[in-house]
């Protein structure tokens, strides 16, 4: 091993950024193929490549942090800054979709019938499945906070229980959202309303799936005794991400489901 006189982690060459970029290309191209030609081969290939990349990359990070001790305090500080900047970029990502929605709804054009929702669109009832989804996500925010406090108090059993509850609530939210999509009286091709609705709620749903995956990895780490009350940034980052997803949903519910209907 080469001696280094600093506390920073010098990463070895890794193929996972390249395979991750390849999987992103395959998935986006696969989505276009699915929308236009009803072919899912490319999309499924991209999803498989993405799943394999996530598994290998998370395995490497766990090995470097838990077994090799590369995540020193300066490295953890850098990871915190990185996660904060990542969530900030996500805020601006969703801001673009909200901008598109409000731009179209506050001054509807004659082509939309001069009012919002546009002529011919029957919006979803905000007091049915969307309200249940809101309750589910708020409950998951409580349970992940419970898990965090249990971890800091070295209460292993309660941490596992609370984290498992959070993951199950995330899966339940995803299933409810999928059922809502199937039963929706409009599609993504139904003008500006359909496109902004499905793009915004769809990307939020994707973030819930990513967050649920992130928390599942944290659960496996906790079961393998990787976390301590002082060293658990992986879980902390997942909790930040989950709270961000919660807040985005509240804005989404108030804007698109309640006000927009």
Swiss-Prot record:
PANTHER family: CYTOCHROME C OXIDASE SUBUNIT 3, CYTOCHROME C OXIDASE SUBUNIT III. The keyword Repeat does not apply. Its EC number is 7.1.1.9. Component of the cytochrome c oxidase (complex IV, CIV), a multisubunit enzyme composed of 14 subunits. The complex is composed of a catalytic core of 3 subunits MT-CO1, MT-CO2 and MT-CO3, encoded in the mitochondrial DNA, and 11 supernumerary subunits COX4I, COX5A, COX5B, COX6A, COX6B, COX6C, COX7A, COX7B, COX7C, COX8 and NDUFA4, which are encoded in the nuclear genome. It comes from Pongo pygmaeus (Bornean orangutan). This is Cytochrome c oxidase subunit 3. SUPFAM superfamilies: Cytochrome c oxidase subunit III-like. It is found in: Mitochondrion inner membrane.
